[in-house]
Amino acid sequence: MPLLDYCLERGYELRFIELMRMGHLAKDSNAFLQQFVSLQQLLGLIGEHHEYLQANAPVDATAVRYEVPGKGFFGVIANESVPFCRTCSRLRLSSTGWLHGCLSSSNRHYVGDLLDKPRHQALPALQGLLMKALGDKQEVAFSGGATIMKIIGG
């Protein structure tokens, strides 16, 4: 808990993230399960050192937020334990110009070439690509994928 203590002492809101079934873990369930720490396990560990209460978060938040009374807040992005796909409003744009609508989908849409088009052509094309990317989102829960998080800027 040293990192959480460090953040609480300085007023930083730490985010923990559950391991996700991405990259090599998408197909290797044993490796995933050996490394996975669930939301409940994490809260159990934190509870040994701190009292905490669940705090409010926006409807489309990816993190479940908690308050350590008198000390600060922390959050857990727990997509395996508490899937948030249904309310996810995020899109990701890679540094190479690819738009990703969902971490669970290998679909991607290239927007880099729109930079060379005049505005009256680029905007409708961008709107179409945004709609396609939003259509890539999972309905209920993250299902994993071969995409590696570092490629899409998770």
PLM features: residue spans?
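Radical SAM enzyme [4Fe-4S]-AdoMet core and its adjacent flexible, acidic
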Residues: 1-73
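N-terminal, helix-rich and Lys/Arg-enriched segments in bacterial and organellar proteins
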Residues: 1-6, 15-19, 24, 39, ...
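C-terminal accessory regions of radical SAM enzymes
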Residues: 50-104
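Flexible mid-to-C-terminal extensions adjoining Fe-S/redox cofactors in radical SAM and related proteins
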Residues: 80, 86-154
